[in-house]
């Protein structure tokens, strides 16, 4: 394709007509390295590999500057498809975190389903058994001007998740959902998957040592390549425009969970084979960027070149080479293995698991070899259509983006004290951002595989016991508050980390690792890039200062993640949304607790003082229609002490329930603890300071409300004081109403059934 000698305007026009999204300057740099005009297939390969989605060209420098990725428990950091941390000397947890935002806005069902499909492949290709997923979701205002579209997107996304996940046989154990007008035209569908693997059975997504010298086979398994998902990574690296919606539908992949299930079982046989033979293979899923991305990254990661013959691909029709290179056909993996295993591997997939009869055209095919040269070469019909330096293709391109603070001119509102706090409580409990998520997770199979200990909705985090003969469990939580990010991207990032860790601690697990999915607007706009940079700085500071328990000054490592830019439409960008997942390890699952109250007469305690921090709160937004300015901040020593106190108290079996304070503040937190129990509460906030009562009740400053077992209150106070905390006794669990008083005056008295009806119906009504 002509590049050299064309004016910028001519070149840009030529690239767009060909369906290529790169800039003229990027095309020129490719031609300069090659010393010639690139072929059309080469430009398509570079377009995918140099997309924001694949190359991290805007974000990589910021991530490297701030994020802590190492730790004593880290087995594999964020260098491959998933991160790995140790559970004990034998077992490891594998975790990956991705986004599928643009596809889910265009085709909600297919977009969400393929998001799940891609993330579980990332975990499986490390040699792991996939044991759970989580789904942090962000939708538009269900009562706003785009309500019909918002509800259509939300319903489709939820359907896609449960239809794919249930058929695949992987439980959803965690998730959250936020509704806001900023997501009207750009929903966020983030997905997390975790798996378990023995430390000595980990498989890497790279060409193994010696594979180039020995000419290892490159084997493609799964669905026949078609044109589905073509240009998906380019589509994900641009702003959404309504007038282009129909044209973009082809960039959304087509899922098949039944085939995926069969592939996972066949993969287990592959893993068993390589263990028996004592050989190392490379194994990688085909996701964004398709065959080109998977094969070139595996070769480059091993320090080798790669030769691919497209005529050997199993395909679903006649397609030009550029389509075969970058199509994102789902349910595919790539294997790099010794030639002496070729027939055994082909037999596993084509005969033992009979892929051709499971899905028409599916199979395993040898499509190339690893080489010792430094080139990435692709042939089609006997001719070279791609011949480029493999490190140049995979190394991407880097931009030093300009950043400039966004000025919002936010102020604290002067609102009056509500006359009827009962009404305020009921309205907040019914808010779609607080109400029960049962309307969503009732569709999910949360107990498939039989390992789930704590299900969605029962606690702040999910918990599973993936190894039957062992006592340990894996906890998972996902969190982010875009309303905080709107006020302060820095504190939005920091609070997301803190809340994710609090949620894991609330069941008694110790935070072990973090992942991030960073959802922002157009990085070419200085204000948007500043929001990204500030959020990363905030979450990194939280990870560095909250520490791995038992390892002072050691950050909680961030071992996996994703950056999703261009979550923007002509109507505007999403609020800064750094979604954090936290994995915790529970040494003895029999000690885990939930958030529902257990025994009348038990003491209720508050950990964490209340501050005048209602900026971005549900109270301000829902009741008064304002954002505010005083966003919650993370006081790192205080936060660390609260988390450690709860973990230790659960371990000593003196807490019966715990719930972290977040959306809605202390009052909503305490009321939610009644929702899944037959109990009420009687609390008094007289000793919490001199702030106005509504601010004390609804401030979203971090903390916990905990139920302390009768007779164990002194021991709990002693634990808290050992961490320099002064817990406040709020009151006790009762058999009556939800009561909150101050200085002898009853502020709130709710019938638990009335409160439960508001809480259980809010999300159902919003998505009706």
From Swiss-Prot:
Keywords: ATP-binding, Cytoplasm, Ligase, Magnesium, Metal-binding, Nucleotide-binding, Purine biosynthesis. It is found in: Cytoplasm. GO terms for molecular function: ATP binding; magnesium ion binding; phosphoribosylformylglycinamidine synthase activity. Pathway: Purine metabolism; IMP biosynthesis via de novo pathway; 5-amino-1-(5-phospho-D-ribosyl)imidazole from N(2)-formyl-N(1)-(5-phospho-D-ribosyl)glycinamide: step 1/2. One of its GO terms (cellular component) is cytoplasm. Substrate binds at residues 99-102, 121, 253, 328-330, 564. Pfam families: AIRS, AIRS_C, FGAR-AT_linker. ATP binds at residues 56, 516, 561. Its EC number is 6.3.5.3. Part of the phosphoribosylformylglycinamidine synthase complex involved in the purines biosynthetic pathway. Catalyzes the ATP-dependent conversion of formylglycinamide ribonucleotide (FGAR) and glutamine to yield formylglycinamidine ribonucleotide (FGAM) and glutamate. The FGAM synthase complex is composed of three subunits. PurQ produces an ammonia molecule by converting glutamine to glutamate. PurL transfers the ammonia molecule to FGAR to form FGAM in an ATP-dependent manner. Belongs to the FGAMS family. This is Phosphoribosylformylglycinamidine synthase subunit PurL. The lineage of its organism: Archaea, Methanobacteriati, Methanobacteriota, Stenosarchaea group, Methanomicrobia.
């Amino acid at each position: 394709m002509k590049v050299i000698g064309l004016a910028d305007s001519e070149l840009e026009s030529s690239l767009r007509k060909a369906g290529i999204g790169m800039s003229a300057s990027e095309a020129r740099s490719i031609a300069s390295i090659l010393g010639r005009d690139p072929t059309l297939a080469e430009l398509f390969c570079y377009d995918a590999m140099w997309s924001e989605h694949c190359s991290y060209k805007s974000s990589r420098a910021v991530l490297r500057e701030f994020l802590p990725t190492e730790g004593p428990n880290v087995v594999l950091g964020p260098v491959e498809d998933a991160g790995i941390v140790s559970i004990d000397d034998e077992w490891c947890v594998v975790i990956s975190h991705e986004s599928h935002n643009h596809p889910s806005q265009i085709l909600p069902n297919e977009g969400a389903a393929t998001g799940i499909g891609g993330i579980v492949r990332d975990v499986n290709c490390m040699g792991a058994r996939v044991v759970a997923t989580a789904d942090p979701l962000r939708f538009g205002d269900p009562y706003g001007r785009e309500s019909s579209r918002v509800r259509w997107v939300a319903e489709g996304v939820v359907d896609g998740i449960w239809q794919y996940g249930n058929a695949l046989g992987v439980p959803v154990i965690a998730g959250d959902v936020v509704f806001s007008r900023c997501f009207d035209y750009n929903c966020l569908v983030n997905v997390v998957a975790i798996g378990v693997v023995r430390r000595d059975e980990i498989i890497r997504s790279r060409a193994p040592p010696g594979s180039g010298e020995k000419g290892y086979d490159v084997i493609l398994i799964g669905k026949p390549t078609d044109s589905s998902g073509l240009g998906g990574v380019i589509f994900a690296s641009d702003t959404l425009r309504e007038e282009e919606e129909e044209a973009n539908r082809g960039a959304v992949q087509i899922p098949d969970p039944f085939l995926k299930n069969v592939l996972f079982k066949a993969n287990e046989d592959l893993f068993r084979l390589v263990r028996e033979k004592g050989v190392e293979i490379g194994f990688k899923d085909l996701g964004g960027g398709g065959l080109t991305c998977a094969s070139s990254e595996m070769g480059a990661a091993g320090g080798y070149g790669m030769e691919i013959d497209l005529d050997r691909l199993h395909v679903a029709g006649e397609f030009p080479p550029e389509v075969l290179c970058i199509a994102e056909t789902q349910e595919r993996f790539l294997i790099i293995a010794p030639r002496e295993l070729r027939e055994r591997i082909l037999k596993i997939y084509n005969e033992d698991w009979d892929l051709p009869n499971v899905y028409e055209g599916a199979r395993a095919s040898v499509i190339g070899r690893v080489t010792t040269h430094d080139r990435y070469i692709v042939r089609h019909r006997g001719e070279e259509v791609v011949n480029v330096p493999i490190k140049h293709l995979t190394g991407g391109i880097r931009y030093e983006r300009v950043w400039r603070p966004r000025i919002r001119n936010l102020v604290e509102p002067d609102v009056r004290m509500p006359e009827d706090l009962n009404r305020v409580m009921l309205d907040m409990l019914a808010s779609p951002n607080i109400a029960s998520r049962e309307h969503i997770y009732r569709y999910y199979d949360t107990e498939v595989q039989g390992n789930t200990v704590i299900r969605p909705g029962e606690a702040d985090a999910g918990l599973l016991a993936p190894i039957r003969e062992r006592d340990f469990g894996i906890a998972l939580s996902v969190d982010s508050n875009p309303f905080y990010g709107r006020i302060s991207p820095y504190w939005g990032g920091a609070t997301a980390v803190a809340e994710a860790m609090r949620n894991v601690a609330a069941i008694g697990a110790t935070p072990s690792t973090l992942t991030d999915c960073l959802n922002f607007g157009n990085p070419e706009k200085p204000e948007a890039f500043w929001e990204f940079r500030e959020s990363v700085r905030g979450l990194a500071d939280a990870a560095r200062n909250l520490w791995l328990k038992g390892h002072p000054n050691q950050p909680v490592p961030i071992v996996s993640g994703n950056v999703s830019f261009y979550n923007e439409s002509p109507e505007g960008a999403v609020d800064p949304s750094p979604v954090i997942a936290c994995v915790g390890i529970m040494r003895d699952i029999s000690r885990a607790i939930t958030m529902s109250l257990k025994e009348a007469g038990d003491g209720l305690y508050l950990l964490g003082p209340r501050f005048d921090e209602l900026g971005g709160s549900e109270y301000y937004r829902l009741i008064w229609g304002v954002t505010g300015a005083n966003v919650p901040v993370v006081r790192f020593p205080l936060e660390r002490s609260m988390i450690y106190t709860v973990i230790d108290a659960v371990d000593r079996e003196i807490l019966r329930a715990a719930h972290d304070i977040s959306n809605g503040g202390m009052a909503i937190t305490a009321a939610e603890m009644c929702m899944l129990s037959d109990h009420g509460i009687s609390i008094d906030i007289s000793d919490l300071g001199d702030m106005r009562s509504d601010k004390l009740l609804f401030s979203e400053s971090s903390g916990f409300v905990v139920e302390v077992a009768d007779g164990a209150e002194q021991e709990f106070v002693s634990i808290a004081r050992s961490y320099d905390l002064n817990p406040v006794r709020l009151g006790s669990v009762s058999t009556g109403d939800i009561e909150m008083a101050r200085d002898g005056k009853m502020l709130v008295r709710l019938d638990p059934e009335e409160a439960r009806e508001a809480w259980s119906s809010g999300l159902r009504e919003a998505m009706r």
